[in-house]
Amino acid sequence: MKICWFKDSKIGHEKQVQAILDNLALTQDLVIEERDVSNPVWLELFLYFLRIKPKQDSIPDIIIGAGSATTIPMLRYKTDNKTKVISVMKPQFFESKFDLIVAPRHDYKEVPDNVFTYVGSIARVNINPDLENIGLIVVGGVNKHFDFNDGYLISQIDFVISLFPDINWIVFNSRRTPKGFNEKIKRNTSIRKFIDVHKNFEPLDDYLSKAKLKFVTPDSVNMIFESLSSSGETYLFDMHYSKENKITRLIDEVKSNKYAGFLEEKYLETSEIKTISLNKPNLLHGTFREVEKVVYEIERRFRK
């Protein structure tokens, strides 16, 4: 099977497509051509309306990509009706032109015939029966969905460490994490290792597959579902939001269904004193396998 993969250089997008192709390769012999998207969207639209097709050496069976920058280049590259164009995530333009769109369920109130939905985001399934005594703390940062409160998050981290004092705690930050928070984490002697994206970067994937416990801030949606797709227990920190939207509703769904455990702030009975409590996940849900559902749907629809 010949695959043409359009890439927009965004790690989160490319990891989702890579997970699909890795899973598809378990049952199909794949020949993958990668194409980087470089033109601005307006130029791609201009070329699309002029029906100017890019050069290609062979006709692919599937054209696939994720992210708005890949939408028009993928459609322009299709020259044969036998080629199927798949958008991973809801495209910015021309939804009806795609043979298949695989997108988060929260993006659609009504699902068209050419759309297949999944929960959250797509991630590689990683099953490890030999988990290590490691706890991960994965911190996002300033965002438009949740209030990033340094003090409240630090108090939750201290609470978690006090519950599991024998765990080796490793903290990962992100480019969005405030400097003040980073400085506070560096001073916490209960943390075994602080992996700062700016100074001593290490791949999170190396730890995600072997950590017994994983605590993630709810603004890091892709990371939540990467964690849920790996062995070990996933928990969400408590972050307040002022306005409900599809992301906050998704996080509420994850918590209400107990896909992940979560921290919660409550008042003591008949008191003005607030406490933090830990709610456990329902382990009967098992490891998330959304990528396998997506690949099954691709094979079902486009089986030769």
Predicted regions and their residues:
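Nucleotide-activated sugar donor-binding and catalytic core shared by glycosyltransferases
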Residues: 1-304
